Structures are given as structure tokens and as C-alpha cells.
Amino acid sequence: MDFKFIQKILPRLYSMLPFYFAPRSSFPPIQAFFEVTYRCNLRCDMCHYLEIIEDTETNKTFKNELSADEIKKAIAKLPRFSLITFTGGEAFMKSDFMEILEFAVKNHKVHIITNGTTLSEKVVEDLLNLRLKSVWGCGLFYMGVSIEGGEKLHDTITTIPGSFKKTTQGLERLIARKQELKSKFPLIHLTCVINRGNVMDLVPLYKYAN
């Protein structure tokens, strides 16, 4: 089964059918994005949230973020089997993120975008315990991990020395454990902000992804 095709065509059909058959109505949303925190342990120089992240950490404004209970109430209003994307900041910097995640996977497919630096053995194990078992079910469906280029360039972009090693170690830890379990899910994709500064590193990054 071609999941990329399904992922592409179904949302399009879902949004277009009411347009043709019932123009004054629409189906409930099937995908929702939650920026659960603006805390982050990296400072990527191209990040458009950089000022917000700095303010969040410096002035402790993360204390004003939605609580786990508030986010769970919003999730509970979504149609069953919706696709929920969690991002930040760095989602795993939110202290109660796992509580939110455990609630979300009960009735939905979940996608997480992360920089991968916090994927310890325990976190990986907890995530795989929440993984999707069948494409027709609920659970952790997708994981997106951010890598901006080779080691030197990645660390320059994130402005944090050693961040590339932490990210790749976390990613490879996740892949290895997934293989041990002989699990198809979660599917894994790499994310990269392409610009003039890292375009020459894309071929090595592509080879690494393969």
C-alpha cells in the first residue's frame, strides 16, 4: 500500500467533496496542529520563532502555555481518527507532553516533529509503546526529525555544538528499537529548511536518509 499516495489524495478528496455536492457545508477537520510549547534547547539561526523562544526561556513565559488538560479538551473535540501533529518549539521540552501524547493516541493518529536531541532510551521505549499497530487504527503514526546538513553545518545552524550527534544518536536509537520490534510504525521522515547556506549538504543528507 502506498502510504504517500493515500496521505496526499485522501485529504484532497475530503475537502473537495463538500465543495461539489454541498457547497454550504463542510466535513469536520481531519488534521490538527498543536504547537504545545515555545521552549527549545536549540537556537536555529533561520527559525522564525527564535525571538519567541528566547522570550519564553528568558522570561519563563512557558508558564502561561496551555496545560495538558486544556490541550486534551481540545483534542477530545476532534473527530475520531484525526491526524494530530505536535510541534513546538521542541515538543519534548514540555514537561507534561507524554501525558498529552498518551491521551491523543487513544483515538487518533499522531505525528510528532522534533529535533531528536531528547530521544533517550526511555523516551524511545515510551514512544514505541504508543506506536500505531495498523494503518486503520490509532497510535503514533509519524515522527519527523530535523537535520539541517552535515555535522559541522548542522551545529553551526543550530548554534549548539554537539547537537548533530545528539540528534543522529536519538534518531538511530529510535530506528534500531523499531527494527528490534519489527514494527512498520512510526514512519520516520527527516525535515530540513533548505537555503543557500546548506544546499550543498543536501546530497550527503539524502544519502544519510536512505
Describe these PLM feature segments.
Residues K94-N210:
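Conserved AdoMet/S-adenosylmethionine-binding subsite of the radical SAM
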Residues D2-K133, C138-F141:
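Conserved alpha-helical substructure of the radical SAM core
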